[in-house]
From Swiss-Prot:
It comes from Bacillus cereus (strain ATCC 14579 / DSM 31 / CCUG 7414 / JCM 2152 / NBRC 15305 / NCIMB 9373 / NCTC 2599 / NRRL B-3711). InterPro entries: SAICAR_synt/ADE2_N, SAICAR_synt_PurC, SAICAR_synth, SAICAR_synthetase, SAICAR_synthetase_CS. One of its GO terms (biological process) is 'de novo' IMP biosynthetic process. Keywords: ATP-binding, Ligase, Nucleotide-binding, Purine biosynthesis. Gene3D superfamilies: ATP-grasp fold, B domain (3.30.470.20), Phosphorylase Kinase, domain 1 (3.30.200.20). One of its GO terms (molecular function) is ATP binding. This is Phosphoribosylaminoimidazole-succinocarboxamide synthase. HAMAP family: SAICAR_synth. PROSITE patterns: SAICAR_SYNTHETASE_1 (PS01057), SAICAR_SYNTHETASE_2 (PS01058).
Length: 239
């Protein structure tokens, strides 16, 4: 498979065309951003870590029958994925009160929820990716009610798999963001990435943070935190 011209560059990844009409080449960048791009930094090794961790987690999900766009890891920072039409919704699943939910509900960070909460955010940088209801989604016409139901069900299914998987590594899955895409055949599959960039991951005993909050809140060395997650997942750490 050959990498051809650049199709799209986002905050964390570059997407390239390949000679296959149904595959694209993804390159993970070393850039870190927070607060809708207001805080930016280049962090050497971050792209490699997110690629490694996403590869491990997508393979785990595929093992239990969850369909994803992941095809194969090509290098330390690159992977081949199926081409999909991204649904412009971020699907956030929360197991523990943290971040914006703590501020919105006035509840203490770290409060464990009796059951997961699934939220939808409209992907629009100019609007700041606002939280939207299912009624809003219908007005925006970005997904059908049937598709929203599938997104919710898949998010909850993925949540349970990841909760169990991270628990086996002594990590608490606090919350995480997913993105989904539609194949040419009309099937909804998991896309984008699952990494400490898109999850809140805390040590199950100390609540030490191993995710992008380390960068957001200036809590320490970001790559050290991501390396710890990779090591606990059984990947090859470069520390």
């Amino acid at each position: 498979m050959q990498k051809l011209e650049l199709l799209y560059e986002g905050k964390a990844k570059r997407i390239y065309r390949t000679e296959s009409a149904d595959m694209v080449w993804v390159e993970y960048k070393d850039s870190a951003t927070a607060f809708n791009g207001e805080k930016k930094e280049t962090i050497t090794g971050k792209g490699r870590l997110n690629n490694e961790i996403t590869t491990l987690l997508f393979r785990k999900l595929q093992e239990v029958g969850i369909k994803t766009h992941f095809v194969e890891k090509l290098s330390e920072t690159e992977q081949l994925v199926k081409k999909v039409s991204i649904i412009p919704l971020e699907v956030v699943t929360r197991n523990v009160i943290a971040g914006s939910l703590s501020k919105r509900l006035g509840m203490e960070e770290g409060t464990v929820l009796a059951e997961p909460i699934v939220e939808f955010y409209f992907k629009d940088d100019d609007l700041g990716d606002p939280l939207v209801t299912e009624d809003h989604i219908r007005v925006l016409n970005v997904a059908s009610p049937e598709q929203v139901s599938v997104l919710r069900d898949m998010a909850l299914q993925i949540n349970q798999v990841l909760i169990d998987h991270f628990a086996s590594c002594r990590v608490r899955l606090v919350d995480f963001k997913l993105e989904f895409g539609v194949t040419e055949e009309g099937e909804i599959i998991l896309a984008d990435e699952i990494s400490p960039d898109t999850c809140r991951l805390w040590d199950e005993t100390s609540n030490e943070k191993f995710d992008k909050d380390v960068f957001r809140r200036d809590l320490g060395n970001l790559t050290d935190a991501y390396e710890e997650i990779l090591k606990r997942l059984g990947g090859i750490s470069h520390v």
